[in-house]
Amino acid sequence: MIKTLSKAQKMEREKFRIPRSVQDAIPIRRIFADGIFQVGNQYSKTWSFTDINYAIASKEDKTSMFLDYSELLNALDSGASAKITIYNRRINKAEFERSVLLPDKADGLDEYRHEFNKMLTAQVTGTSNSIVRERYLTVSVVKRNADEARSYFARVGTDLVTHLAQLSSVAQELTLTERLHIFRDFFKAGEQAAAEFNIHEHAKRGQHFKDWFCPDSMEFAADHFKVDARYGRVLYLQDYASYIKDSFVSELCDLDRDLMLSIDILPVPTDEAARQLQSTLLGVETNVANWQRRQNANNNFTATIPYDMELQRKETKEMLDDLTTRDQRMMFGLVTLVHLADSKEQLDSDTETLYSTARKHLCQLSTLRWQQKDGLDTVLPYGLRKIQALRTLTTESTAVLIPFRAQEIMQPNGLYYGQNVVSKNMIVADRRLLLNGNSFRLGVSGSGKSMSAKEEIVQIALSTEDDILILDPESEFGYLTEALGGEVIRISATSDTHINALDMDRAYGDERNPIVSKSEFVLSLFEQLIGDGMVTAKEKSILGRCTEQVYLPYIRNGYKGTPPTLQDFYRLLQMQPEPEAQGLALSSELFITGTLNTFARHTNVDTQARIIAYDIRELGEQLMPLGMLVTLDAIYNRVIRNWKIGKRTWIFMDEIYLLFRYEYSANFLYKLWKRIRKYNGLVTGLTQNVDELLRSDTARLMLANSEFLVMLNQSATDRVELAKLLNISDNQLGYVTNVPAGCGLIRCAGNIVPFTNSFPRNTKLYKLMSTNPSEKKE
């Protein structure tokens, strides 16, 4: 026997004690405040790690991930054993309601909250999408005391986190409470704890730490066990196929039940493994020589070596080559699995399903007869291995049992964005937590952009007190805005709605003197009227002087009363002695006293509403540049005002490509994208003209720097451009190629996840959000 294995078995050997209570059946001897357990003669520590997009990666990316995972396995210390655990647990109902569902507010909008909650609840009442899949890595080592173990885990933990980071998986050391939660969720599924575990409080009260998570009863039979009212069974992988697909573990874990699968790994030092293989090879060669000698003695000089001997020789040589020339390591592996059900019949049915899945991969799962207790202690992430059905593997053959499948986006207190196509789990993201929460929604006409944005607006309006500002060039958001109690400001040359371009309060501008900020705005306004670069230095001086003079009475009155208008500014210009002032007045006459004077009068709409949609569809070509300037100025200063009182602002800009046609609005957007996070705001841009958007270098930069992107069905040319810009693989592009409305890819903080999102049609919210012309007629 290999020295490493015999030493490990000797260290792990314990005296058998008949458990007198449920607590005695839990094999943890001691716990420490930093999450270390003493189990048997060993100390163990657990890390959680996130999933990566392995299933939808391209062949090249899969190979790269496989090699990186192999490096992680090679980095495991041969003085310790490792356990990789995949835990499927059912979503906790109370936790789901607290973090995802919208609470009632008695503000007249609860009807919409109930509709939205009904849709969210329907997403998790099925089977597959009510399961959360978690991943853990537990390292166990024999040390003389906890301090030695602590030093060891500190060193090993750094290596593990680094290697998992190369795979784009985020590893995190589990605290004591987080680690105990794994066992509580397993033994007491769905039962809410009266209080979180606190080691000091438990010690003060004289309670045993096991009381917090152990079940009320545990019964072990020949081929199953019972935990309280639930049934469970531990299986192990008895026979391995010659070639196992990398999807094997993932398919085993697709069972829609509470399930835990563990892969125990005991690495062997390469020199020791090589010596063992050389000894084995020598034995094989000796057997071959003896067989050949016997054949020669019988005058059988043409006999070929028996197949089993030849195969043994070939496999031993190949494994020796793997170790000496291909940087492989020898490892002992063990795969165990426990699944739970509400009845014995369901348990037997699930076991047969798992057997069938294994047979499909030419492997054999078997039930641990009369070893259910030892099996349970092995599969749970205590850090123990009590089942000795070890299989000799290399790094590659261990790496095939890869625990990765599909990335999940499930952030607490986030907004719902659809369902993960691969895992069927909900996608819940919190843009507020991202380094840059700005977002684009890209897709051809009819792909579901507006619907997706409206669904996000509904959630923000119903679940927060944040302000929502919408720039609406296509008149698509009016009905929804009014239904949510907001204000629609329809701006055109012929409408009775007016917005005063010179509106200003004490909070105007960022952190500077409001009059300085307003002077810059007035200068930009006249550059739009006269032409960019056409305003001379003399004219700039006149404009600055007039801005100060026109606001003087208003400022002296403490920013109270009625602010001046462009008509007041026009009269002041006419009173200036310089001929340039008369030229400025004449150039601006059409937009101040003429027919296009929409922005030259006092504001006559509610610009303080919590939700505002600026409908600029009817502005026309002549008034559009000025309209954009005034509207964007109003939006920006609302953001600043909210920031000063500690309020968040969400901005939605439909057909954002239109803003890049005008230099001022393009520059404004770029500055807004860079600075809005500082002012507690988030911007979302929607467009179907991705090609036109990408012609702007500014837009490309904004797109690349946005941490949250929703990509729906794309045209062929747009797909190619986006793939280059955002590094999207061909496999992933398939999710934005000829797909139904509401389907596509979400990129959140660099993670790309395929999603689908359909809202129930028989709801009031759907009718408010739908932009389908045929549905609007209905």
Residue ranges and their predicted role:
Residues 449:
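Conserved lysine of the Walker
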Residues 1-404:
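Extended, folded cores of ATP/NTP-driven motor/assembly subunits in large transport
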Residues 459-469:
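Post-Walker A helix-loop "phosphate-sensing" segment adjacent to the P-loop in P-loop NTPases
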Residues 452:
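Hydrophobic positions on the alpha1 helix immediately C-terminal to the Walker A/P-loop
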Residues 441:
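Hydrophobic anchor at the beta1->P-loop junction of P-loop NTPases
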Residues 52, 59-78, 89, 253, ...:
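P-loop NTPase motor domains
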